[in-house]
A protein has these predicted regions:
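Non-heme Fe(II) oxygenase metal-center motifs and adjacent flexible, charged/small-residue loops
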Residues: 1-185
Length: 185
């Protein structure tokens, strides 16, 4: 999705940020993150506008939108993440204030795992290896019917994940600030 030079520049930018440990109901995760545009707080289940998406992410937002067949302006949330060796993400579905997800993996490969509950109580499983500089899109059934996780890696990895707002997210956004579309000029 992006070239080597762009990846190096993005990693340098990400390493210069003060990313915070991921918080989930009072627990601290092994990965470090920062949200722009919108932020979902897992400690109190709040959803609010936060700092605007930085200008230096505009070209990668454009690439993510082109990859996902989306308008760049619809990608109103971005989550930057650093995964030190041993860090992964447990099984989950993204919160319902978000809809489509376009992620980009940087530095090292990641295994994106999927599972869907079956009628007999078990799981149907699949996985995809996401190479550095490549992307993935979660929409439709993959987004809403399957859970996903990222296996812990043994090397430093970064990710940039863009999201659109769902109908619910847009309703909440309109109630709180009157607009949902963010354009950086």
């Amino acid at each position: 999705m992006i070239g080597c030079a762009a990846e190096k520049e993005l990693i340098a930018r990400l390493e210069s940020l003060e990313l915070a440990p991921f918080r989930f109901h009072g627990w601290l995760g092994n990965r470090k993150t920062q949200s722009f545009g919108w932020r979902y707080d897992f400690d109190d289940a709040s959803f609010a506008r936060t700092d605007p998406i930085p200008h230096w992410l505009e070209s990668v937002r454009g690439a993510a939108a082109a990859f996902g067949g989306l308008d760049p302006g619809d990608l109103v949330h971005v989550l930057l993440a650093r995964y030190d060796p041993g860090a992964g993400i447990g099984w989950h579905r993204d919160r319902d204030v978000f809809d489509q997800v376009v992620g980009i993996s940087l530095a090292t490969p990641a295994r994106l795992r999927f599972r869907q509950r079956t009628e007999d109580g078990g799981f149907r499983r699949a996985s995809v290896d996401v190479e550095p500089r490549s992307g993935y899109r979660l929409s439709g059934s993959a987004r809403w019917d399957w859970e996903h996780s990222i296996a812990p890696g043994d090397q430093l990895r970064f990710s940039i994940t863009f999201r659109t707002l769902s109908d619910k997210g847009r309703r909440i956004a309109k109630q709180t600030c009157g607009t949902v579309r963010q354009r950086n000029g």
